C-alpha cells in the first residue's frame, strides 16, 4: 500500500490452519469435601421412668444411625483453557509453504511492515494461546526477521480479551513491538490486570479496539 517512502506492507499470518496441536496443562484434582461422621447411637429412655431403675426391656429400641453419606466431589471452578509449551521439533505454527511465502514477502520493499498474527508473538508469561507455546517456531519467526534485516515491523495480535503492548529487543539496533487489541464484545472476566515482563505498560481488560496512525514526518 502506498509508494516510495510511504509504502506500507500488510502481512497477515494464518496461525491456526496448519498449526500443531496445543498441549493442555494438567487440570487440578477435584476437591474432596469431608463428611462429618454421624453421632453414635444412643438408646431413647422412657421419659416417665427413672433411668436408674429401668430394665433392659423397658428401654426403647435404639435409633438406627443414618447411613454414612458418600463424600461429595465438588469439581474445581471452570478454568480457562491453558497450555504449556510444545517442544517437539516437528511441532509448528506455520507450514513449510507458509514459511517460504513469509520469507518472500519480507524481501519486498516497504517502509513499514505490519504483521498480523491472531495470537501474541512476544508476550510469553501467560498460559493461553501464543507463539510461545511453540518456542522453536517463535525463535524461527524472530530469526527470520533478523535474517532479512527487518527493522521496520510491528506486530498486531489479538485473541486475548484484553489490550496490551509488548516489546522485545530484536537485535542491538531494533525493537519489535506487538500491539494486542481484543475484544469488542468479550472483555476479560479477570479481576486483576495481566502482567507480562514484556509489557511496556499496564494491560487493559475492558472492551477495546485499536487505531494506528502513521507519522511520516
Spans of model-derived segments:
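Long, structured stretches of catalytic cores involved in phosphate-ester chemistry, encompassing
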Residues: 1-217
Amino acid at each position: 500500500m502506498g509508494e516510495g517512502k510511504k509504502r506500507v506492507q500488510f502481512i497477515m499470518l494464518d496461525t491456526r490452519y496448519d498449526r500443531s496441536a496445543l498441549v493442555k496443562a494438567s487440570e487440578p484434582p477435584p476437591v474432596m469435601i469431608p463428611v462429618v461422621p454421624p453421632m453414635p447411637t444412643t438408646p431413647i429412655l422412657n421419659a416417665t421412668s427413672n433411668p436408674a431403675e429401668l430394665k433392659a426391656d423397658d428401654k426403647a429400641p435404639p435409633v438406627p444411625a443414618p447411613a454414612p453419606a458418600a463424600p461429595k466431589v465438588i469439581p474445581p471452578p471452570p478454568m480457562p483453557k491453558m497450555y504449556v509449551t510444545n517442544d517437539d521439533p516437528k511441532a509448528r505454527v506455520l507450514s513449510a509453504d507458509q514459511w517460504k511465502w513469509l520469507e518472500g514477502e519480507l524481501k519486498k520493499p516497504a517502509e513499514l511492515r505490519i504483521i498480523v498474527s491472531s495470537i501474541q508473538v512476544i508476550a510469553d508469561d501467560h498460559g493461553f494461546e501464543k507463539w510461545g507455546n511453540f518456542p522453536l517456531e517463535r525463535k524461527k519467526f524472530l530469526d527470520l526477521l533478523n535474517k532479512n534485516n527487518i527493522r521496520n515491523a510491528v506486530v498486531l495480535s489479538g485473541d486475548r480479551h484484553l489490550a496490551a503492548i509488548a516489546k522485545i529487543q530484536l537485535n542491538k539496533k531494533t525493537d519489535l513491538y506487538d500491539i494486542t487489541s481484543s475484544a469488542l464484545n468479550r472483555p476479560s472476566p479477570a479481576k486483576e490486570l495481566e502482567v507480562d515482563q514484556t509489557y511496556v505498560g499496564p494491560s487493559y481488560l475492558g472492551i477495546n479496539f485499536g487505531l494506528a496512525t502513521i507519522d511520516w514526518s
